[in-house]
Amino acid sequence: MYALQAKQERNGFKMKKVLIFYASYGGGHLSAANAINDYIKNNYEDVETEIIDCMKYVNKHLEKVTTTAYKEMAKKAPWAWGTIYYTSQKGPVAELTSTSNKILARKLNILLQEYMPDLIISTHPFASQMCSFLKKHNKINCKIASIMTDFAPHDQWLVGKKCIDYFFVAHNKMKEDLIAKKVPAEKIFVTGIPLSNKFLLNFDRSDILNQFGLKENKKTILFFGGGEFGLGKSKTLKVLSSLLNDFNNIQIVAISGKNIKMKHKFEELAHNSNMPEDIKIMEYTNKVPELMSVSDLV
């Protein structure tokens, strides 16, 4: 169960309450939610926050089935996920999704009535849809903010748009696209996608290079190749192989994440390459901000 027992009073005044929803279809939605949560906690003493996986809360079994399917398609058949992504803009798939979220919203309403937030922040369109449906039917009356964790405005974000108070988008073109889709300009804010404060820190370049055994006189490439999306396994390996064999005076930090099979493939490529001593292979790491600070290309 999520910890929902919050202090109602602190230092004589009532705490504002913010619910931050995400969904586990890729790590970006949670990363954005965590970044927002950290910022609020560090800057607003009178605001209490809670982060919740909306799909896991409303139906754990459905969440497990759909996230597993998502990950498998992303790894083994990214074209299939691409098809779903585009067909869910409009038509039967879009209707099925929005109808399902309306049904699931009833369970989410239990949480909202218990917590009584002053503001709902959503980093996934499913949560935005559920909350906007509840607001439309007068089950909730708090403000709703959609943090669009995409670089293009998928129509799933716009279901129930009349009941969503704020849209935070990655760039100006997205704002223009939303205006073209009848979202009022005063609701749209160009902020970029939320990032951890760690990415704003200034690191000592020499210290970081030494920490990871990197050379000062070589260009550094930070290569991500183990995630759920991207080029797919064969193209990822082809790109890394080209970097290893066709370029001079570079060093590579190749991050395979939690994908152990990809890590082994990286190691095999490195062993057979022209520069095995100039590639560092890493699994999941929380040192990405530091590595990015010394990288010439990501």
Give the positions of each predicted feature.
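Extreme N-terminal starter segment of soluble prokaryotic enzymes
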Residues: 15-18
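A short, glycine/small-residue-rich beta-strand->loop->alpha-helix junction that serves as a flexible
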Residues: 23-32, 231
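Conserved N-terminal ligand/cofactor-binding loop architecture of enzyme catalytic domains
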Residues: 35-111
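Active-site and donor-binding regions of nucleotide-sugar-utilizing enzymes
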Residues: 83-181, 187-190
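A nucleotide-sugar donor-handling region in carbohydrate enzymes
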Residues: 165-228, 260-261
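Donor-nucleotide binding loops and adjacent catalytic segments primarily
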Residues: 215-294
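Hydrophobic acceptor-binding patch used for acceptor engagement in glycosyltransferases
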Residues: 297-298
